[in-house]
Amino acid sequence: MKAITLLFLVGFIGEFQVFSSASSPINCQWGSYAPWSECNGCTKTQTRRRSIAVYGQYGGHSCVGSAFETQPCQPTRGCPTEDGCGERFRCFSGQCISKSLVCNGDSDCEEDGADEDRCEDAESRPACDKDKPPPNIELTGRGYNALTGQFRNQVLNTKSFGGQCRKVYSGDGRDFYRLSGNILSYTFQVKINNDFNNEFYNSTWAYVKETSTEHSSSSKGRFLFFSSSSSSHGYSSNTNILTKKKSYQLLVLQNTVEVAQFINNNPEFLQLAESFWKELSYLPSLYDYSAYRRLIDQYGTHYLQSGSLGGEYKVIFHMDSEKVKKFDFHSEDKRKCASSHFQFLFTSSKQKCTTMEEVLKSVSENEGNLLRGVPFVRGGHSGFLAGLSYLDLNNPAGNKRRYSQWAGSVPDLPEVIKQKLTPLYELVKEVPCASVKKLYLKRAIEEYLDEFDPCHCRPCHNGGMATVQGSQCQCYCKPKTSGVACEQGVLLGDQAGGVDGGWNCWSSWGPCVQGKKTRSRQCNNPSPSAGGKSCIGETSETRQCEDEELEHLRLLEPHCFPLSLVPTKFCSSPPALKDGFVQDEGATFPVGKNIMYTCKEGYSLVGDPVARCGEDLQWLVGNMHCQKIACVLPALMDGIQSHPHKPFYTIGEKVTISCSGGRSLEGPSTFLCSSSLKWSPEVKDVQCVQREAPLTPKVPKCQPWEKLQNSRCVCKMPYECGSSLGVCARDERSKRILPLTVCKMHVLQCQGRNYTVAGRESCTLPASAEKACGVCPLWEKCDAEGSECVCRAASECEEAGFSVCVEVNGREQTMTECEAGVLRCRGLSISVTGIRPCVAEAA
């Protein structure tokens, strides 16, 4: 059984505020459209695509509209699906299948059944006594987008048996099913886990970092993306549930139900779905990211190598960190909770995790004892999903019944879970120019993954993690921080300190030199400062050029490189643009290729951004330059810090300069970005000097009704009083008599209010209520069993409190609050006649 790890915020020492001001919202901005693709000979259309120039962040708007545009055109080449199949059989759709599948009694042409249309002798056909495939077998043939965690359109033909008669026994169903030719192994084995896996995360940052998947593009540049379960019933990943107004801890409960397990065949033996095969046929044999990206949008980045059919249940409960902090969790409480596996939520038991139940009730922010969470459910009947979004802390049996109803519906409506994936480009086959298209699809998937690299995002404050989701950058905050940019709150403990560095995006690939090319990146998003950690990884990367592989394919498949369309000459790398760079540069620059320039942050491009590789192998570049639109700080000496630390500052923004290490700043500390895009005052000759240690000021000794603030004693507030003896007090201004405490009277008199002690019979003091151990007043202590507060003896007073004048049996005497409280606790009738010692009042 999986042990529970409770990640609670305890034992932190020190706090450090890294950022304090919110970042302005950044709206998403589209870039310019790329050139139109080659005209598709099958659909007689061409497409073009625009990429995102600026990702939305810090609460800014998403990009509106489609990234693609399509228009009709006149093709210069025919449709590949109209070509012949050689020695193979051609379906009406144009797809080619083995002749051994013709007239075998099965419709192996997925859409039209052409392979069985002209079979005269039906009795001589091979026969299988079972034609019924396993339930929901079509789920095993879908594509999968590894970035979004969503299943896409069908890529495998799960209806074809491949001319084989392989059967599998269902077990509980007492029936036999015939396996698809694409299935290597299929097992009916129901697995229901009665123990719920559960984890605590001390922040949304910790949850996303734990559940994110680390991906590598071909460039070996690693980055994280958030991949969550998606459901056909609408419970999909929605980051808006991770509210930005507070810091939250997360409790995650999850479980799975398995119905069957499957393994698909090796790629070379898989039969493709006709719709997917057609799209592969339509792909151009010249690299055009727009065309290949459209295929990725429709069919995903991977297909299923193996997995299980079943259901997946996960619910996330958000707990206000400030409320959780009020509860003291002992090691014994944690041990009980860990051993219970949270079964107390689903099964009635005498041994309950009491402390945990109290925490859940306190932080639920919901009515009664209903703990509402955010469910992520895959599989099962949609009618049961609403009941999975909450838990009734007083009705474990009801919780179990609702979960069991959903789990019981999973065998009838399963989804794929626990999937293992293979890249989609491994399925590029049985189409013209398959080797070339396979290479280009691999390149397009790498380019697609790079679009979602967090390097496109601006830094989150306080060490938050940025992820790309659609056209937005989302910040996930560390413990005790919150806000759209994680700008609110403080970092705690060993996380307090400087700003850790983050990688910027890779540069474009350099030219091929001896069959290799190189690119680089910088650790400046943000740059490490104030002792923060530097980036982990390499600053440069080298890999083999694709040119040699393309030249080899040109020899094997020369028809895929028509001379009229494929240039044999290439331009060198495009000229550099000061304060700018080439957008989506690519690896090679054939004659006729257009590229687009853009400017780095803080600059705007003026002029024509498009350049073209000419016939003379020279770049045709128009007049353009990057115009400064913001202020940039000059390089500062070591030990000088800027706040806020940003790559550039817009007009009207201020930056504050400070020194670290106990040194003092010479010169102005605040600078304004003026309308002339210069700093006012000018940032020059700023330096830090060692300052003499200041004399430690004498700390004044405050009265009990005072507190130390800014090196001087000031009056406390009444609510800051702790346990104190109750008295009746007269407000000499309004003549009202009201119940107060000795401490509160001292505080009010300190603030200039005139209160005097009145007789005890003049007001009703609050009745002494039974209190649990831990909150006993001065004159009480915990009993031997440690369950409730009982009266102390006068000699047992540990904290005396104020000295007051008390009348006992008609005689006034000076006592401490604790001594007087002991007498009152033991039933003696006493009356407080003054809030100071009797002798002092007499004087």
From Swiss-Prot:
InterPro entries per the UniProt record, alphabetical: C7_FIM2_N, C7_KAZAL, FacI_MAC, Kazal_3, LDL_receptor-like_sf, LDLR_class-A_CS, LDrepeatLR_classA_rpt, MAC_perforin
Annotated glycosylation sites: W36, N202, W503, W506, W509, T696, N754
Region (CCP 1): 545-615
Keywords, sorted A to Z: Complement alternate pathway, Complement pathway, Cytolysis, Disulfide bond, EGF-like domain, Glycoprotein, Immunity, Innate immunity, Membrane, Membrane attack complex, Repeat, Secreted, Signal, Sushi, Target cell membrane, Target membrane
Signal peptide: 1-23
UniProt keyword Ribonucleoprotein present: no
Segments forming domain TSP type-1: 27-80, 500-549
Domain MACPF, residue spans: 124-456
Protein name as catalogued: Complement component C7
Gene designation per UniProt: C7
